[in-house]
């Protein structure tokens, strides 16, 4: 939440929605942060559903009813976007046929263990080889579940977030690709 509010982007152009399906004490921490940032003039809301139905896709589907933005940036709770993120990514949407901008990410804990090193290597391969090849070939790039920005119209035209899947990112990506 702090990282999103620290983005180098005009505050009046952002509508920040914290989708919180947690069932532990983090809810109070989120509520306090949201209250603090509202006091600083941020358009920020803490959205809790009465159910966890559909998990992440369910939360995203629910939130789409309340967004007033043309673009929807999605960050998982463990993602820390760099301050320049929106300033570098949003200009790609100047082309009206762009529905998704998927950004690469780094690793804060890459050297923590052999497992995190292997995960970092795998993700680096995905970004540096697979997605680079797709981009250079002008092929559609899939949404990786976080660190991506969607044109809201693209989500809507593709049928929105479906909750009967555990891979909501790929599901929406493929439906958007089939729609053109």
Stretch-by-stretch model annotation:
Residues 15-17, 156, 171:
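Cell-envelope/extracellular polymer assembly enzymes that use nucleotide-activated donors
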Residues 12-14, 98, 180:
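Short glycine-/polar-rich loops that comprise or flank the Walker A/P-loop
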Residues 32-71, 83-166, 177:
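Long helical/loop segments within the catalytic core of UDP-sugar-dependent glycosyltransferases
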Residues 1-2:
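Membrane-proximal cytosolic interface modules of multi-pass membrane proteins
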Residues 166-172:
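Acidic donor-binding loop at a coil-to-helix junction in glycosyltransferase catalytic cores
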Residues 5-47, 52:
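Acidic donor-binding segment of Leloir-type glycosyltransferases
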Residues 21, 69, 77-79, 168:
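Short acidic donor-binding/metal-coordinating loop in glycosyltransferase active sites
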């Amino acid at each position: 939440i702090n990282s999103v509010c620290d983005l180098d982007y005009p505050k009046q152009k952002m509508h920040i929605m914290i989708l919180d399906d947690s069932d532990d004490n983090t809810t109070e921490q989120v509520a306090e942060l949201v209250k603090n940032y509202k006091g600083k003039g941020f358009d920020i809301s803490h959205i809790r559903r009465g159910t966890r139905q559909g998990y992440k896709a369910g939360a995203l589907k629910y939130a789409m009813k309340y967004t007033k933005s043309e673009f929807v940036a999605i960050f998982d709770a463990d993602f820390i976007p760099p301050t320049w993120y929106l300033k570098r990514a949003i200009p790609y949407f100047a082309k009206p046929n762009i529905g998704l901008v998927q950004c690469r990410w780094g690793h804060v804990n890459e050297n923590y263990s052999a497992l995190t090193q292997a995960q970092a290597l795998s993700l680096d391969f995905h970004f540096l080889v697979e997605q680079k090849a797709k981009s250079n070939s002008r092929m559609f790039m899939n949404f990786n579940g976080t660190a991506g920005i969607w044109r809201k119209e693209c989500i809507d035209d593709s049928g929105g977030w479906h909750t009967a899947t555990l891979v909501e990112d790929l599901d929406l990506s493929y439906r958007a690709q089939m729609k053109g």
